[in-house]
Swiss-Prot record:
Pathway: Lipid metabolism; phospholipid metabolism. The keyword Transferase applies. InterPro entries: FA_synthesis (IPR003664), Phospholipid_synth_PlsX-like (IPR012281). Catalyzes the reversible formation of acyl-phosphate (acyl-PO(4)) from acyl-[acyl-carrier-protein] (acyl-ACP). This enzyme utilizes acyl-ACP as fatty acyl donor, but not acyl-CoA. This is Phosphate acyltransferase. The gene is plsX.
């Protein structure tokens, strides 16, 4: 299967040349596979820097943009930058010139532009950011982790459907379960929206819904899919990442390699903008080389798994 991956080099916390070098590392690691190719999107200046210094002159292809989106740009200003590197990448995705787009840039801008350019699944009201996190039993899927600050119960139900479909695509469990991230396990816990969502999930999924789950229990692997609003989910995710980084720094070499590998969230691809008919991956703006490497490599695997088509099929 031929796979064409697009990557926006602009707008992240790292230099575009750092992202480019990671892209070259991925190419080198898959040198024997001629069915994988990349298209990068960058400013004219960055393209010139790449062409003047890279040993891969002209390959991967670099598409020059008139502008790029910064972390300070609002969604509205991002829309106005019609020739930004991010917008060009999404245009290529819309026109099937690439199979997936990866960005380390402005999350709100990426989601807004994606919604304006890429069709959503017919039954989904809002996209959600979906990530995988390590657990004692493998990995769990959690969504939303930042696309929507507030959502209603019907939208949370849509997140649960997409999360279950995604988990089934991974092939590590035949009958995935779902839980609702909340401040307690009891049914009455949380806001009115949480209580309504609890009842809706129970009515819809019955035995597959295991009730509320507290943040500390996510890593036990007691549920396969964790549903959350984007505000709570984002705080959970960044806290978890911070704890891992803290432990890695404090314990250093004392942390056994197999334990470190089990805790390491960077082995998984970045956040998938779930709900779109095409694959868009958001890597953390501060992502290190390894995290970016795995985000790019993971996107190749998701394309080959036809994850968007399979989620759509499950929602039909």
């Amino acid at each position: 299967m031929n796979v064409q991956i697009g990557i926006d080099l602009m707008g992240g916390d790292h230099s575009p040349l750092v992202i480019w070098e990671v892209l070259i590392d991925v190419l080198n690691s898959r040198a024997s596979n001629s069915h994988i190719s990349f298209t990068a999107f960058a400013s004219h200046e960055v393209k010139e820097q790449i062409l003047s210094h890279s040993t891969y002159k002209g390959y991967p292809e670099v598409i020059a943009s008139e502008s790029f989106i910064t972390m300070e740009d609002s969604p509205l200003s991002a829309i106005r930058k019609k020739s930004s590197s991010m917008a060009l990448g999404l245009d290529y995705l819309k026109e099937d010139k690439i199979d997936a787009l990866i960005s380390t840039g402005n999350t709100a801008a990426l989601i807004t532009l994606s919604r304006t350019k890429i069709p959503m699944f017919p039954t989904v009201r809002r996209p959600a950011l979906l990530v995988r996190v390590p657990t004692m039993r493998g990995c769990a899927v959690i969504l939303d982790v930042g696309a929507n600050v507030s959502v209603n119960p019907e939208e949370m139900l849509g997140f649960a459907r997409m999360g279950l479909a995604y988990k089934q695509c991974l092939g590590d469990t035949e009958h995935p379960t779902v839980g609702l991230l909340n401040i307690g396990s009891e049914e009455r816990k949380g806001t009115e929206a949480h209580r309504l969502t609890f009842r809706l999930l129970r009515e819809t999924f019955q035995h597959a819904f295991l009730g509320n789950i507290e943040s500390g229990d996510v890593f036990s692997g007691s549920v396969d899919v964790v549903v959350s609003d984007g505000f709570t989910g984002n705080i959970f995710l960044k806290t978890a990442e911070g704890v891992f980084d803290f432990l890695s720094h404090i314990l250093g070499d004392k942390l056994e390699s197999d334990v470190k590998r089990q805790l390491d969230y960077t082995i998984y691809p970045g956040s998938m903008v779930c709900g779109l008919s095409k694959l868009v991956i958001k890597c953390h703006g501060k992502a290190c080389g390894r995290s970016l490497f795995n985000g790019i490599s993971g996107s190749i695997d998701l394309v080959r798994a036809r994850v968007c088509e399979r989620i759509l099929s499950s929602l039909s």
